[in-house]
Amino acid sequence: MPANSRSARLTHLDDAGLPTMVDVSDKAVTARSATAESRVRFPAAVAAQLRANGLRSAKGGIVETAVIAGTMAVKRTHELIPFCHPLPIDACRFGIDWAGEQVLDIRCTVRCVHRTGVEMEALTGASVAALTIYDMCKALSHSMSIGPTKLVSKRGGKRDIGAAQ
């Protein structure tokens, strides 16, 4: 067992082991940001078709729809994940582009000024954007895969993670 894991504890459990929302009322209000990434992998023929069609499907613009869905998800993260605080989101930006012949890379960066971070919002945005891309393309194939989805960076809390975005 790593030395630091003995003192670490799950923050969403109280002393009795019951689930609870973290009390952030004593935390300082600071600028917070987080970037998350997800990927959608397509079969070669589907990727070629999407490239030829400018990332449009019979349902419409794939990237545009994914950005809208991801943004909506960022703003509603607290409704989806029980112990997330509702946050005043100041910015939400997506980057969606090819990362190889068959993989679309989705990056979601979220910013706010508050007492708690926006990692879950960024992860939720990237995840829902990836799910939306799957939905937009499933008429072409169900052999797509999503992942990995991961936190790339976060700034403004107790500890920063990853490179500044």
From Swiss-Prot:
InterPro entries, per database record: MoaC, MoaC_bact/euk, MoaC_sf, Mopterin_CF_biosynth-C_dom
The UniProt record lists the keyword Lyase: yes
Catalysed reactions listed for this entry: (8S)-3',8-cyclo-7,8-dihydroguanosine 5'-triphosphate = cyclic pyranopterin phosphate + diphosphate
Enzyme Commission number(s): 4.6.1.17
The protein's annotated pathway: Cofactor biosynthesis; molybdopterin biosynthesis
Residue sites binding substrate per the record: F83, C84, H85, M120, E121
GO biological process annotation, one example: Mo-molybdopterin cofactor biosynthetic process
GO molecular function terms listed in the Swiss-Prot or TrEMBL record: cyclic pyranopterin monophosphate synthase activity
Active site: D135
Membership in a protein family: Belongs to the MoaC family.
Function (record text): Catalyzes the conversion of (8S)-3',8-cyclo-7,8-dihydroguanosine 5'-triphosphate to cyclic pyranopterin monophosphate (cPMP).
Name of the protein in question: Cyclic pyranopterin monophosphate synthase
GN (gene name): moaC
